[in-house]
């Protein structure tokens, strides 16, 4: 193996080279992403780095960014196709586990399909995808008991600020900024549709419903995807799916599309455990992925 690659890996492990620079330099030294992957394996790096190297060979770029919110800077992971754009854009909202490698993989999936994707870290102090710190335990308990997600005001503001940050970027198609979220983030994606009349589309993976009185504020089409093997109690996420569909029909002028995958558990779009969590390739996940892109394409065509 080239001595320069070994020296570079030692500098990365010592913190002298950041993650993005390390991956880019390995790809360059190896002569491309395809050649870099086995070298990273030989150097003993985990599959997360290997996926990021593969992403560099998929005509996309990734970067860490920040945007202001409430006097703080919110860290975020951004993935986009190569080129100036403007691109259709999605805010990717993480699970309660924070900005995990799974969520970054979702962002790269969107970028490979010609979207710009911004995945903010909305969990204070939990931007690496670890276990939740308990801050949201009461919120989760209340949501599971009632089947209704009441998102705190400060988190609503962070969603608005993420949208405002994207609206100022030249590579963003500002007429087509949507959101997609998973569980904790699914509830926030659904809620954001009630807060932002300019949101293009909202995709909800096994996320709870906002307060029913807020549904008439929705001005974007919503796609909701549920696992049939999720808790099926009347107030659970899946248990409320049919009621949500009825309420959306009666209260919102915009389309609400929903699917329940009978053999899918809660969290079916994610595979693996941290730090090796990633987008699943199971049948329900693949079908849901295709349905999501079909949904976004249809409502993009309709303007």
Language-model region placement:
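N-terminal export signals
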Residues: 10, 19-46
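N-terminal secretory signal peptides
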Residues: 1-21
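Alpha/beta-hydrolase active-site loop
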Residues: 138-170
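Short beta-strand/loop motif that positions the catalytic acidic residue
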Residues: 224-226
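Short beta-strand element of the alpha/beta-hydrolase
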Residues: 87-95
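N-terminal cap/lid segment of alpha/beta-hydrolase-fold proteins
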Residues: 50-83
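Primarily recognizes the serine-hydrolase "nucleophile elbow" in alpha/beta-hydrolase
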Residues: 160-219
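C-terminal catalytic histidine-bearing segment of alpha/beta-hydrolase fold enzymes
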Residues: 252-303
């Amino acid at each position: 193996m080239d001595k320069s690659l070994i020296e570079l890996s030692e500098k990365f492990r010592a913190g002298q080279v950041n993650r993005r620079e390390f991956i880019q330099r390995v790809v360059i030294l190896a002569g491309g992403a395809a050649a870099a992957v086995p070298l990273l394996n030989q150097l003993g790096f985990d599959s997360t780095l290997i996926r990021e190297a593969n992403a560099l060979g998929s005509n996309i770029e990734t970067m860490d960014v920040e945007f202001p919110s409430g006097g703080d800077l919110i860290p975020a992971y951004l993935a986009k196709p190569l080129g100036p754009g403007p691109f259709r854009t999605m805010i990717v909202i993480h699970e309660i586990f924070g900005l995990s490698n799974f969520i970054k993989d979702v962002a790269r999936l969107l970028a490979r399909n010609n979207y710009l994707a911004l995945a903010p870290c909305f969990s204070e102090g939990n931007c690496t995808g670890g276990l939740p710190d308990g801050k949201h335990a009461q919120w989760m308990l209340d949501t599971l008991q009632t089947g209704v997600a009441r998102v705190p005001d400060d988190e609503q503001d962070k969603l608005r600020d993420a949208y405002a940050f994207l609206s100022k970027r030249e590579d963003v198609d500002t007429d087509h900024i949507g959101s997609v979220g998973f569980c904790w983030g699914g509830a926030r994606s659904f809620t954001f549709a009630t807060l932002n009349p300019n949101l293009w589309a909202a995709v909800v993976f096994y996320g709870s419903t906002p307060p029913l009185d807020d549904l008439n504020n929705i001005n974007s089409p919503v796609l909701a995807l549920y696992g049939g093997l999720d808790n099926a109690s009347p107030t659970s996420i899946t248990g409320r799916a049919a009621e949500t569909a009825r309420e959306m029909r009666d209260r919102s002028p915009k389309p609400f599309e929903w699917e329940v995958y009978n053999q899918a558990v809660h969290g079916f779009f994610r595979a693996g455990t941290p730090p090796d969590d990633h987008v699943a390739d199971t049948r329900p996940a693949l079908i849901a992925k295709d349905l999501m892109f079909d949904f976004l394409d249809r409502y993009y065509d309709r303007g």
